[in-house]
From Swiss-Prot:
The lineage of its organism: Bacteria, Pseudomonadati, Pseudomonadota, Betaproteobacteria, Burkholderiales. This is 2-aminoethylphosphonate--pyruvate transaminase. It catalyses: (2-aminoethyl)phosphonate + pyruvate = phosphonoacetaldehyde + L-alanine. The keyword Repressor does not apply. Its EC number is 2.6.1.37. It is an enzyme of class 2 (transferase). The gene is phnW. It comes from Cupriavidus taiwanensis (strain DSM 17343 / BCRC 17206 / CCUG 44338 / CIP 107171 / LMG 19424 / R1).
Amino acid sequence: MIRGNDPILLTPGPLTTSLATKQAMLRDWGSWDAAFNTITRSLCDDLVRIVHGEGTHVCVPMQGSGTFSVEAAIANVVPRDGKVLVPQNGAYCQRILKICKVLGRASVELPIPEDQPASAALIEDALRRDPSITHVAQVHCETGAGVLNPLQDIALLCQRLGKGLIVDAMSSFGAIEIDARTMPFDALVAATGKCIEGVPGMGFVLVKKDVLEASQGNSHSLALDLHDQYVYMQKTTQWRFTPPTHVVAAFRAALDQFLEEGGQPVRGARYRRNCDTLVKGMAALGFRTFLPTAVQAPIIVTFHAPADARYDFKTFYAKVRERGYILYPGKLTQVETFRVGCIGAIDDNEMRNVVTAIGEVLREMGIEMQGRLAEAA
């Protein structure tokens, strides 16, 4: 894959992007220009099609990081007297709870171990114990540890019980199958700098038309008002406030490449090969994954840190970076870990190369894995 000489980002976003995506940012755009507004409209149409939401859902783009759009979705979809159940098995679930608190939306935390997925049975029990809950906010792929939560089961449960569902699909959209016809949701949130392989700076909410229409007046914020953003765009074809023009242009290029590659099935298969290659190679070095294979998403893998006293993450990170690879620190609360991402404009050859680099660093630091020095790959 052609990228240039930049370090490889093995993170859950920002990601390593293709040269074509980078080149798309070399042109300046007028934010009110018809050509730019055509790009925005085409993006929204394609994003809705990816989840088979034609006729039922619309796309509302939003400036800022993905968290801006998560907050916008909760603020608009959940009425001010609503109540949100948050199945919590990681750092990004915790962020949703914090958003609810700041917004003044009542919330209920459903604690789940960090190495286990949410389950429809646990969620149903929580919903039946508290009938005042109106919505469930579910992270699809919790990249704190890399757990893939069972979206379809949870979506069908919410539909059966008449509860609204907001999905944080930040790290799954474009890689894991999501079908609005069989996984009904009120709103689903993702962003440019994840599995479509764009650059950070814009999020988007795929929201049911009737839910969006009913959300007028719910938002606490002018800038994050999805209803107002959508209505204004429909009337004028323009963004309400200055859009991230270069980000939008790069996302159009990234989405074109996504579709040319074969869309979600092919993109997801590449990430799965990356993940499998990484896990196999790291196991040969003596590393253990934090998660069992059955719940591991092919997005980011959490590894137990070496038990050797000579291990120090900052030193380990710096030495791996010198070899051209940027890792991610762990986000777990109980055990020391680090994370390696499998997504971005990379393939399984890069995963083999990073395993080789990590093996070199272990030997340079004199770190023993399972009672022996790491062997050369």
